Amino acid sequence: MLRLSDEVETGINLATTQSIGEQRITGGCLAITVFEGTAEHTESRHTETRALLSARGGTSLGEKPAKAWEHGRFDAPYLRDALLSAGALCETLETATTWSNLATLKAAVTEALTTALTSTGTAALVMCHISHVYATGASLYFTVVAGQRGDVAEQWRIAKNAAAQAIVANSATITHHHAVGTDHRPWMTDEIGDLGVAVLRAVKQTLDPA
C-alpha cells in the first residue's frame, strides 16, 4: 500500500505529532508505505523502499505515521457532518489517470476546485493524495474544506461540476472507486462513449424495464 499526500495535506498532518511523529519536519510530501506478507518479505520491501526514497532526498519518519494512519483511516469521513454543522463545507472526490498525466490532472482539478469555491468570497483548502497505485497509473483523492456560502449543496455542486469538467478535459476517469451515481450521470457519455451508454440502456431495458 502506498499513500502519497501533497504539500497541503501533508501540512495538515504536520500540525500534530500524533500523525507525523516526533521529528521536526517543515515541508515536503508525506508518503506512507505498508507491505503484507512474511516477515522476511515485508522487511525486504521496506528496506528497498527506504533506500529508493532516501536516495532521492526523502527522510524516514519511522513507523509512527503509518500506524497513526492505520488506526484512524476511517475516522475522517465522520468529521464531515460535524464540519457542516460548524459552518464549513467538507467534501471529497476522486479520479484516476496514467502516470504521465497525473501531475497535469492534479494541477487542473486543484485549480478548478479552488477557483469555483473562492469565487464566492470564501477561503478554500484543497488537499490531495495518491490513494491507489498501479503499473500504469494511480488514483487521486481530493478533500475540500471551505466556508459555507448560501445553499451548501449548490455551492458544492458548482465546485464538483468544475472539477468534473477539468477531469474530462484532461482525459481522466470521472470516478475511480466512488462509482457513477447520479452525480456523474452528465459525464457518462464522455466516460464510456455513445456506444457504451447504448449498451447500458439496452441491458437496463432487458433486465430491469420497470
Region roles according to the model:
Residues 1-162, 170:
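C-terminal substrate-recognition/cap domain of FAD-linked oxidoreductases
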Residues 173-180:
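Short acidic/histidine-rich active-site segments
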Residues 110, 157, 165, 174, ...:
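Long, contiguous binding/interaction regions
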Residues 126, 171-172, 202, 208:
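Generic secretory/membrane-interface signal
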Residues 181-210:
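Activity-critical C-terminal alpha-helical subdomain
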Residues 98, 178, 208:
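Conserved acidic catalytic centers in enzymes
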